[in-house]
Regions:
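Short, acidic, metal-binding catalytic loop of nucleotide-sugar glycosyltransferases
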Residues: 19-28
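A conserved acidic beta->alpha catalytic loop
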Residues: 33-45, 61, 92-95
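Glycine-rich, basic loop-to-helix element that forms the pyrophosphate-binding segment
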Residues: 59-80
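Short beta-strand-to-loop acidic/aromatic patch adjacent to the donor-nucleotide binding site
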Residues: 83-96
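Catalytic beta-strand/loop signature of glycosyltransferases that borders the donor
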Residues: 119, 191-197
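Acidic donor-binding loop at a coil-to-helix junction in glycosyltransferase catalytic cores
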Residues: 173-179
């Protein structure tokens, strides 16, 4: 298991995320922290990662979230090659894994699944909402919205990730959904673990990619142009109704 944490100028939040990796009852075999931060903050992150015993790299691809994830993918392949039992487990710097996350996922991986996902708890001052994933998913679920898989509860076989085309660096938001559409088009063997294993912190008093309207609008337009061929008329309407309701973005 390779754990991957992408960070961008959020030292205090990163510390919480790294602590949640360090406290895993089943430790990852490799940990990669990839930084999109300023030079000053990168120095602070290096010190923090050294305290945890984790390696940190500067994102050397496109300077966004997808570029950082792909930097990690390249690094994993360089150091470990590609094998059928190597898994990629990502965590956003503002989220945290429960201490039993990796152990629970591994315990449920009885059939060498391509993808496993546990439930997210969305947590902030204004919400405490457990997103229960349906037991069956397809690419259709990610065309309209997101039923509850994010960067922080994605546990995927490296080979499946590569077959799906890795992460689209042309997008600055909607990266998880875009990736999962392509993953589910592969008809992967997957398992939903119906337990709360990851806490997704959704505080609105700081900028998150999800709340940056310009990035979101631009990425949703690209997403629609990429995948409209998979949507029927009703699904297209649902897509636009959702973005109007959630982000006030009009057709």
């Amino acid at each position: 298991i390779a754990a991957v944490i992408v960070t961008c100028n959020r030292i205090e939040l990163l510390k919480r995320a790294l602590k949640s990796v360090k406290e895993q009852s089943r430790q990852p075999n490799f940990v990669y922290v990839i930084s999109n931060s300023t030079a000053d903050n990168f120095l602070k992150e290096q010190k923090l990662c050294a305290d945890f015993g984790f390696q940190i790299l500067k994102n050397y691809r496109t300077e966004n979230y997808a570029g950082a994830l792909n930097t990690a993918v390249e690094q994993i392949i360089t150091e470990s090659g590609i094998s059928n039992d190597l898994y990629f487990a990502s965590l956003d710097d503002d989220d945290e894994w429960l201490p039993n996350y990796l152990q629970e996922i591994e315990n449920n991986n009885s059939d060498n699944f391509d993808l496993l996902a546990g439930n997210l708890l969305r947590s902030s001052n204004t919400e405490n909402n457990l997103l229960a994933l349906p037991n069956e998913l397809s690419e259709k679920d990610f065309l309209i919205g997101n039923p509850g898989i994010s960067g922080s509860n994605t546990f995927i076989k490296l080979i499946t990730l590569l077959k799906s085309g890795a992460f689209d660096e042309g997008l600055s938001a909607t990266i998880d959904r875009d990736f999962l559409v392509r993953v589910f088009l592969q008809k992967p063997k997957y398992k939903i673990v119906n337990k709360h294993l990851v806490t997704q912190h959704t505080d609105n008093d700081r900028e998150r990619v999800t709340t940056n309207r310009t990035k979101k609008e631009e990425s949703l337009r690209v997403f629609f142009y990429k995948y409209q061929y998979l949507m029927n008329k009703v699904e297209k309407e649902q897509f636009f109704q959702r973005i109007e309701k959630l982000f006030s973005i009009s057709k």
